[in-house]
A protein has these predicted regions:
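Short coil/turn segments that connect the beta-strands within blades of beta-propeller domains
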Residues: 70-71, 121-122, 167-168, 212-213, ...
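Flexible coil segments in periplasmic/lumen-exposed cytochrome c-class electron-transfer proteins
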Residues: 577, 589-602, 606, 613, ...
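Blade/loop signatures of beta-propeller domains
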Residues: 56-101, 246, 250-251, 450-451
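Short loop/turn segments that connect beta-strands within beta-propeller blades
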Residues: 137-140, 183-186, 235-237, 314-317, ...
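Blade-level signature of beta-propeller repeat domains, shared across WD40, Kelch, NHL, RCC1
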Residues: 527-579
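Beta-propeller blade signature
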Residues: 228-239, 302-316, 459-465, 556-566
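Gly/Gly-Pro-rich "capping" loops immediately C-terminal to redox-active cysteine motifs
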Residues: 606-613, 625-660
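Extracytoplasmic beta-rich repeat domains
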Residues: 105-116, 146-165, 192-207, 224, ...
């Protein structure tokens, strides 16, 4: 075997700087939304600390008037109502064509970027997929400080949807079920408390949501057979204030919709976000799909409160259900009501009504009276075929796919036209179950079959007349649309697609005024703010391995991009370089210095590489790509893989313990060794002993010094 080396370059054509590697995590958990484990995301990126931020911070009363403060963006969806609407008008229909990039900041964490960008007094705060937190100058993009938390375990396909702000603190809910407060001026940890009850199957990915001195967060993990949990913690010290479980236990209303003990692993995760009616102290949550995902015979019944919109009275010591509406009963296709609820007062029948909008991944869009829960309008925005047919052993076609329909960023209400704008995705798939009686195993996917592969879907932006429920206009988008909508008082609607495009449409007519190609997938929501008299529109982009859809045109890395009027060259900042570690307190998730950088070598033979390529093609290529470039799972080579900081020993643990995802540990020892040989050769690790020593079936101490992903090699067999 011979190899030729080519250096892996960063997004600007230069080699990216190295990062300290954090201490290996002994527990690695699989995330079920792809068929293979995402090796490139198995370990956190490094923390960093630079100059402090000196902005005066919002208090609870400031947050309560967030809707009136359009210079800042201090809640995940702008206001408690969850409506991404801004009164800023500097950018309008007459000049949006001159919108240009003000600045760009490149990020080290190449995971799926879904964070809401919060802005307060000239400082932008965001989280990265592996629970890093950054503070940037909102006018220039320059890094102020950067901090990261080293968790007890990490998620494969990790994601963080944002932070919360209040009282001089930045709050983040982490993948290992912690709720953490950071000093907003320095990024130092102030307190760190346990969140989820079921740490075997649960995690946090939603943005920390601050309301009345409470941090409200919901758990992910419904596909792993947990019970969804919404909790509130004190902003002062992290004290647990209340909990609400989405699956009713014995003696609770709705428990009769679960036969036997099926409720114990019923799912119902609240992973996307929530909204609050401040006048009535009503929290709106939307628990996701039941478990097991695809086998309804294990849980015959309505399966409350999964796939539902639930209105909770949180004025007392414990939440109480006011009303609920179930979008899909006894779901068998993972059709979560992922959309964050949007509250608004709209015109229906000549009168103003308090409304709430919700959407799900089946493409259902529902408008309800938010006081009574009565349905005002319900319509399907995606093509629906076979959604009531249960998955079978032979495979059952259905549209949309579990990644189609209406995703978590949802839509927004335009008060100027009394319209609701919402993006959706057209995509079909085949569901196939592998067991009629799947068994619950802690820490593993509880679905009854593999998740359908993502297809080459397309997007649609739809305008709905709130008065009549009829469609006003629809615009086709070339790629799935998951980034939500931002509407401005000047009549513009900004949206995006995972092909990397950002658009500005006329909110009333759908006419396209502007488009920019970011070079990387856009999945996170768009924010707007004003600084020194200048209006900005900003978003974080990036998605390692093009994991959401296989037909993305390019992936140029993760970055924050801010736009303003004018076409001057954008300021380019680099937040990927090596910097000092931030302080971590409370003895949880401490940081450690990296071992010395070394490419190293490892024993493997040409025969093992050949065998490994065959096993990889059969078991892994469908997700990670024939050339390890990443499809529905991230790339296993190149700069994104390098930033995962897996050394050879850690890679071996992940491969042998988590692959294949649907049947971990099912390969023979020599097959795992062969796959390791193939991966090592592809990532330029040279064979030891002139290629005569085979890769062993057990670990090697020397593999800890083998760095992966910094270069890509062409393997000649």
């Amino acid at each position: 075997m011979t190899t030729s080396r080519s250096n892996a370059l960063g997004s600007d054509g230069g080699r990216r700087a190295a990062h300290p590697i954090l201490r290996p995590n002994p527990r690695i958990r699989r995330l079920p939304r792809a068929c293979c484990s995402a090796l490139a995301l198995a370990f956190l990126t490094v923390a960093a600390l630079a100059d402090g931020a000196g902005a005066t911070f919002p208090r609870s009363d400031t947050l309560l008037s967030a809707r009136l403060d359009d210079a800042n963006w201090i809640l995940p969806a702008k206001t408690y109502a969850g409506n991404r609407y801004t009164a800023l008008t500097q950018i309008d229909k007459t000049n949006v064509g001159a919108l240009g990039r003000a600045w760009r900041t490149d990020l080290a964490d190449d995971g799926e970027q879904e964070a809401s960008l919060l802005v307060w007094n000239g400082v932008m705060y965001l989280s990265t997929p592996h629970d890093g937190v950054l503070a940037l100058d909102a006018g220039t993009g320059k890094l102020i400080w950067q901090a990261a938390y080293n968790p007890a375990y990490v998620l494969l396909f990790a994601v963080s949807r944002g932070v919360g702000l209040a009282d001089g603190k930045v709050f983040i809910a982490t993948q290992d079920c912690r709720v953490i407060a950071l000093d907003a001026a320095t990024g130092n940890s102030l307190w760190n408390v346990q969140g989820c009850w079921d740490t075997s199957n649960s995690w946090y990915s939603m943005a920390a949501y601050v309301y009345k001195n409470q941090i409200i967060v919901g758990t992910g993990g419904g596909d792993n057979g947990n019970i969804g949990l919404v909790s509130a913690f004190s902003t002062k010290d992290g004290k647990r204030l209340w909990d609400w479980q989405t699956i009713p236990g014995p003696g609770q209303p709705g428990h009769e919709t679960w036969p036997g003990d099926s409720w114990k692993h019923g799912g119902g995760a609240v992973w996307s976000g929530v909204a609050v009616d401040q006048v009535t102290d009503t929290l709106f949550v939307a628990p996701g799909n039941p478990g097991p995902d695809f086998v309804a015979t294990k849980r015959m019944g309505k399966n409350l409160y999964t796939n539902s919109l639930v209105a909770l009275d949180i004025s007392g010591a414990r939440p109480k259900i006011k009303w609920y509406y179930q979008l899909v009963q006894n779901d068998t296709h993972d059709y979560d009501p992922a959309m964050i609820p949007v509250l608004f007062d709209g015109q229906v029948g000549g009168r103003t009504h308090p409304l709430v909008a919700i959407g799900d991944k089946a493409g259902n869009f529902v408008l309800l009276d938010r006081q009574s829960g009565k349905v005002v309008h319900r319509l399907a925005l995606s093509r629906q075929v076979g959604i009531d047919t249960r998955p079978s052993h032979d495979g059952t076609e259905a549209c949309p796919n579990h990644g189609g329909g209406i995703e978590w960023n949802g839509g927004a209400y335009d008060p100027n036209s009394n319209s609701f704008l919402v993006p959706s995705t057209e995509e079909c798939a085949s569901w196939k179950i592998t067991s009629d009686d799947p068994q619950y195993i802690p820490g593993q996917v509880y679905s009854g079959g593999p998740f359908p592969k993502r297809q080459n879907g397309t997007g649609v932006l739809t305008s709905i007349d709130v008065d009549t429920g009829k469609l006003r206009w629809r615009n086709a988008l070339p790629y799935p649309a998951e980034g939500g909508v931002l509407i401005t008082a000047s009549g513009l609607a900004f949206t995006s697609d995972v092909g990397g495009n950002i658009y500005a449409f006329d909110a009333s007519t759908g006419h396209q005024y502007w488009k920019d190609s970011t070079g990387s997938a856009v999945v996170g929501p768009i924010s707007a703010y004003s600084l020194n008299g200048t209006q900005y529109v900003a978003v974080v982009v990036g998605q390692a391995g093009n994991q959401q859809t296989p037909n993305l045109p390019t992936s140029e890395g993760s970055r924050v991009i801010a736009y303003r009027l004018g076409n001057a060259p954008a300021v380019v900042n680099d937040a990927t370089g090596q910097v000092a570690l931030a302080h971590a307190s409370n003895g949880v998730g401490g940081l450690s210095e990296a071992p010395s950088k070394s490419t190293g070598s490892a024993p493997y033979t040409k025969q093992q590489v050949t065998q490994g390529s065959e096993v990889y093609a059969k078991e892994c290529a469908v997700c990670h790509g024939a050339n390890l470039q990443g499809i529905s799972a991230p790339a296993l080579t190149g700069p994104g893989f390098a930033h995962s900081h897996l050394n050879g020993s850690q890679l071996r643990v992940v491969v042998t313990q988590t692959m294949p995802l649907t049947a971990p540990g099912s390969l023979k020892p020599d097959e795992y060794a062969a796959v390791m040989a193939f991966l090592l050769s592809y990532d330029c690790v040279q064979p030891a002993g002139n290629g005569q020593q085979p890769f062993p079936t057990t670990d090697l101490p020397g593999l800890q010094q083998v760095e992966l992903g910094s270069a890509t090699c062409t393997v000649t067999k």
